[in-house]
Amino acid sequence: MSLIKKFKMKKLLALTLAAFMSFTTVTAMPIQPVNAVEEPASLERQLIPLPVDYEVTQDKFTISEDTNIYVKGLDDEQTDELYENVGEYLASKLRPSTGYELSVIKGDNEGTGNIAIVISDSESDLGEEGYKINTTVDGLTVTANQPAGAFRAVQTVRQLLPADIEKRELVEGVSWDIPCSNIDDKPEYEYRGSHLDVTRHFFSVEDVKRYIDNMAQYKMNKLHLHLSDDQGWRLEIKGSMYGEDLSKLNTIGAQTSTSINGIKAGQYTQEEFKEIVAYAADRYIEIIPEFDMPGHSWAALVSLNFLNSTEDGKPHSGNYDNTKPYEGIDVGFSTFECRNEKTYEFIDEVFRQVAEISPSKY
């Protein structure tokens, strides 16, 4: 290698080493402390659905063993409703995990550190289900135009708390903080519903109640119960017609299940249906009963001979066994006989009995 090339390589190596030493010297300097900048608090990851409008700060209100829940309506009747359906409901959700007594008291809020739930006749713009929540370090106040709005508000309160609040056992080492905020909310849609098919897969009364609880937590207000189809008839109909006991809708039509996990078939008595309706009403949810017809009617047709004009009183079957209920997943193979006057008499009787136990307008 020539002397010129050796010189150039040494010069390049020296420059590279100098640059490296300069870089390491700079990066090795002590890091200067920088004050962290707290981002504005947000509720977007906590609340479903997100309120129409809200402002939140970094401050907190903490529920403690001294916290009480005060409820006050515009009159005694409304106060009683708030006490049972809203105040005691909220307390029942908070007591197991906090271990606090959380007494529910009728009247004006006294002192600090409490939760107040009040109805105001000056908040008519909130409608039936709207609400406001004002939270400061000294307490939380729910204001609504109607008890339904106050009930929707406490679902927001539940979501504002740490997730452990939903546990049904005592949780230790958690500070039950709620971010200080102003929340103004009302539903965008009047009808916020869910559909539950209890025909193809029968759910017990307790199962339906749990489903209603889940709906309530997300401020839904309509439960559409699918009570009849080819695979089953799920509501008791009393009496007899044309010499046949309508209880056959239970003893035959309800003894089906398309479930693959061993769930038994079943039917709701009218008393059980009223129990479901009342449970939902306490959570400001309307039960909408639905009977599929004139199609999807195999469970009724195979149960009651008078609905069929055939010689043996059995439905036109096609490829299906018309001597027993159907437990498959096919659809579109059955229909009431629209030229049979007995069909309309049966439908009238079903609707008459359902109307007596269902307050729904549908």
Q: PLM ranges: what are they?
A:
Residues 9-22:
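Sec-dependent N-terminal signal peptides
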Residues 18, 35-187:
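Acidic, contiguous N-terminal accessory segments
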Residues 22-39:
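Sec-dependent signal peptide cleavage junction
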Residues 124-344, 350-362:
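Feature activates predominantly on carbohydrate-active enzymes
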